[in-house]
Every structure is written in C-alpha cells, then in structure tokens.
Design a protein with these regions (language model features):
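Residue-level recognition of single "structural anchor" positions
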Residues: 1-316
Length: 316
C-alpha cells in the first residue's frame, strides 16, 4: 500500500518557532553542536564557544572559526533568518520558486545574494542524494531539457532534435517495483522508490556505464530501451533487460522515468526562463530531493538543516 504523503511544517508553525534573527541564530548553533564542529586546521573536534566573538575556538590548536564557517552559510552576509525562510519554503512547498520571488518576499534590495543562497541550498540537496545508490529494479532512460544556448554555440547554426544546442541531456533513473497482487489493463502497476537525474555531456556508453556504476548497486536489474548508449550496462549490474520500445509505449514500459521527466519539465517551465546549462543540475537536485523525501513531512526541514551545517562549501 502506498504511504500517505506527509505535509511539511506550515507557515504558522515556522513563524512561531523562528520569530526573529536571534531565534534562528540560536537554533543554527544547536544544529552545529549536534552534528559536531571540526577544526579545519587540525581536525580537532573539541571547541570552546566564544559568545562575545560568536565563534568556536579549537581546544587543540586555538584556531577560531565563526558560526557560519564551513557550512552552507560560509562567507554569506545575509541574515540567518533569510536562510531559515528559504529552507522552510524549499522543504514545505511541492513546487519550486524563483530567486526573484524570494527576493520580493524578503524585501531584499539585491538579487544576486538571494540567487546564490538558493543555488547553494540546491547544491546541498544534490550532495546529499549523491550519498545513496538506487537498488532493485531500475528504469533508465535519458531526457532532454530546454536550456539557454551556451555562449560558444550561439554563433553556430542551430541543430534540430536531440542534438540541439538548446537541449541539455539528462540521465534519469528510477527505482520501480511491480505491485504484488495487482493488475490493470496495461499490466502490473509499478511503485516508485527513489529517483536520480544527472546532467550529462554526451550519450556515449562509457559515460552512461560510469554513472550507472556510481549510482546503482551491482545487484540491481536495469530496464531500458535498446539504445547503443546502454550496451555496457550488462557488465555493471546483475541483469540488464533492454528492448525495442515504440515511442507510444514508453509510458507503459518505463512509466516512472517518464513521469519524473514530465513533472520536472513542468516545474521548470512554470517558474524559470532561460536556464543556463551549467545550473540545470541544481534545479534537478531540488526536484529529486523533494521527490525522494516526499514522506518525510516536517522532518524534511530538519534534514536539510543538518545537511546544510555539514556542507563543505564548493559552490562556484
């Protein structure tokens, strides 16, 4: 039986728990202390808290780091409450929202810091999902998402179809298990588990097999079409079941992959315009993170906060 999708923390509860900057700062320190503070200089894990400096001092080497250091907020001058509001909205809404909308809601003068804030959080989401591999029966296919033409391609003649400069290639994988004891006119219904979406530069078999090896357990079974891009999958997983799939049958043979692609495209089209190819992965990170944690409810806020305080800032 399908689990009920739980609702996240509502706005009234959020405002009650985090009414001001001070409450957000105190809670952020609680998250850091719970996860453990590590000295970036010597690796020490015991620290003094210097209230007057709002910083940690390593008991081993004496070096200090601020409350924000080595977290998603590293180097940010934005208020703690901005970050808490953004994390609340990202984890409590089914759809996404733009940086321009968040900027408007916060009443902040500059767009760029808010844009960076959201992309850092989306990168945190992606890093978290990288820790887990898919298992069982996996549907696998590629999707093509509309993005801006890269600068180095703008002067070249526009290609059509899958090779268009306005399309970014995405490898999509979904755990898909038949529901026991149930049948429909189209066959056995399938229940989805977790999904992954990874932006790729090409459809070479080496590229696909490498990503499959890093994201799917060896004991899994992979279902796909008979594209030559997938010829090496049989060497990566326990079983690779490929077949010729007519275009109008894709939704029946690989249902969850194409539901995920369709829903992700709809989310992007509804909110964003002219997505740069280099940032598409971050938007897909958000989509997959929410989908994979659709049963977490209010716990999703805590999960993203925990991931944020342990995040090693590598955003470019």
């Amino acid at each position: 039986m399908m689990k009920p999708i739980r609702k996240g923390m509502n706005l009234l509860n959020f405002v009650a728990q985090y009414p001001d900057e001070a409450s957000c700062r105190v809670k952020f320190k609680e998250y850091r202390d719970q996860q453990g503070v590590v000295c970036p200089h010597c690796g020490g894990t015991s620290h003094y808290w210097k209230q007057d400096k709002e910083s940690y001092e390593c008991k081993k080497c004496g070096k200090r780091q601020s409350l924000r250091a080595n977290t998603v907020m590293h180097g940010s001058q934005l208020p703690f409450r901005y970050w808490f509001i953004a994390i609340h909205l990202l984890t409590s809404t089914k759809k996404s929202f733009s940086a321009a909308e968040l900027q408007r809601q916060l009443g902040h003068n500059r767009y760029e810091p808010i844009w960076t804030l959201l992309h850092k959080l989306r990168e945190v989401m992606g890093r978290r999902d990288e820790l887990y591999s898919l298992s069982g029966v996996i549907e696998l296919d590629e999707g093509f998402f509309s993005t801006e033409t890269p600068d180095d391609e703008k002067k070249k003649p526009l290609k059509r179809g899958r090779g268009s400069q306005k399309k970014s290639k995405v490898l999509v994988m979904a755990e898909s298990q038949p529901v026991e004891g149930q049948t429909t006119k189209s066959g056995k219904p399938r229940q989805v588990g977790h999904i992954k979406m990874i932006v790729i530069n090409d459809l070479k078999s080496e590229t696909i097999s490498s990503l499959a090896e890093n994201n799917i357990t060896k004991e899994s079974t992979v279902d796909s079409d008979n594209s030559t891009s997938y010829v090496k999958l049989k060497d990566i997983v326990k079983e690779h079941r490929s077949q010729v799939i007519p275009k109008d049958e894709l939704g029946k043979v690989l249902p969850w992959v194409h539901i995920a692609i369709s829903n992700a495209k709809r989310m992007l089209l509804d909110i964003y315009h002219d997505i740069k190819p280099e940032y598409l992965q971050n938007y897909l990170n958000e989509f997959c993170y929410k989908f994979n944690r659709r049963y977490f409810g209010e716990n999703l806020f805590d999960r993203l906060m925990i991931a944020s305080v342990t995040y090693k800032n590598q955003f470019r």
